Amino acid sequence: MPLLWLRFALACYFVGLIYAFFALSRTSDLFSRIALHAASLGMVFHFVSLVELFLSDHVVWASVHNGESLLAFFSMTFFMIIYAIYHTTSPGVVVFPIVFFLTFVAALDEQPVLQTSFVQHKGWLIAHIILIFTGYAALVLSFGASLLYLIQERRLKAKKPSSLISFLPALEVIDQIGYRSLLLGFPFMT
């Protein structure tokens, strides 16, 4: 059943992927809002999938499928937090394709049930995995902000207005997003 919810989330993230490609050529507030609502709905489906997976008895949190799913969910969560703070959807151009790809790979097939030895401190293992993937998600967002910063800086130095990337915010905003993501990502990695 968690795979069904994950596939619903994948369909919603597909709208975000289309937005990412559409935003490269022109900006549209209507399409941006539709993509944000679809991504929010996808996050709800994704969260339900992760909760059902967590409540099942045979879950292996360190598996590739679950790791990709968790990283995609946290990356989208960080994107939504950045959107709530800065009111810019430009990092979505990088984040949406990454989240879609990770969710797509995780939703391809049911994960095989692995027989593992009983872990005595299961709570510590889950906390460790969640903290590591939180750090990874923050670094994914920092990577996206860094790419956007380089593109915007090159555009401003060329002094040619380009309609292709006119949706990017000011360099200071992109720099703050990247810096704060790094500031959050590295401590969670350690």
Segments (PLM) and residue ranges:
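Polytopic transmembrane helical bundles with strong interfacial aromatic enrichment
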Residues: 1-57, 61-190
